[in-house]
Amino acid sequence: MPKRLDTRLESEGGEFLVLGHLLLNRIAAYKTYTNMPGYDLIATKPEANTSARIQVKSRWRTGATGFPISNFDCDFVVAAFLNRGAKDGSKQAKAPEFFVIPVDVVKSLPRDARWSKVDLRQVSDLNQYKENWQLVSDFLANIHAQSKPAQRIARGRVG
C-alpha cells in the first residue's frame, strides 16, 4: 500500500489562508484551538455580538474536487483547494481556490459510505460559492437582524 502523503503543514496553511481571506474582506475572525470538533475558525461581528463557525477542508492535490466530512457542527464549510500539484509530479501547482459553502448545502450532498467523502461537482452552480466571503458577512448581519425582535420582547418592548 503506498504511503500516505503527510499534509499536516499544508492543512494548517489552508486554515491560515482562509483566515487571511476573511480578514482581507473585513470579517473579524480567529483560529480556534487545535482539534475543536466541527470547526476551525470563528468569524465574528463584534458590534452585533454574532459569530459564525467555519470548518476548513483543505485538499493538497491540484484538481481535487471533494473531501471527507462527518462533523457538521458549523455554519460554513470552506473548501480550500490548495492545488500544490500531484504526489507523482503529473500535475502542476497553481493558485489555491476557495469555496465558501453553507453547511446545509454540504450536508445535503451524497457521501460515500466508506470515507464520508463529498464531491463538490455534485453542487449545482458551484461557482456561486467561489471566494464568496460575502455569505459569511450576510450570515453575521442576518443573525443580528433576527435576534433584535427577541431582544426587545425580552425587555418588555415590542416593535
Which residues fall in each region the model found?
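Mixed-charge (Asp/Glu-Lys/Arg
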Residues: 1-37, 42-159
